[in-house]
Amino acid sequence: MRPTVILTCAAAAHAQIFGNFFNQMLKKEFAVEESWHNQEYHKVSCDNGHVCPDTLTCVNSPLECPCQFPASEIKCVYPDKSGYVCISKPGDGYDGSDASSKAEDGKRDCAWVNKAFRGEL
């Protein structure tokens, strides 16, 4: 019985050391990316406008911000115009950006986003 307890404790200690090592590495990597993004954000010259946080694009208002990956995302503006969300385009080629279209079951498009916004899902 004692060897089982010793092996269990050793395995737990090893897992904790291993987990801590990678957790510290991830924290450092994220801090570097965040620091770089903040530096780039502050470099953007945008007089009398708004800098989009995801794309660092200068626009007149936050609702004009483009999606970060326009080839694979569609931008859906909330019904009350308080913001927007970029979602993956449906795989069938339909761009799904028409918020007035009828939301089809299982299809994630702007009509679906509007239903979710209103709490109808």
Swiss-Prot record:
CDD domains, per the entry: LCL2-like (cd23996)
Ubl conjugation listed as a keyword: no
UniProtKB keywords: Signal
Keyword Signal (UniProt): yes
Signal peptide span: 1-15
Role noted for this protein: Probable component of the endoplasmic reticulum-associated degradation (ERAD) pathway.
Similarity field: Belongs to the LCL2 family.
Name of the protein described by the UniProt record: Long chronological lifespan protein 2
Gene source species: Yarrowia lipolytica (strain CLIB 122 / E 150) (Yeast)
Name of encoding gene: LCL2
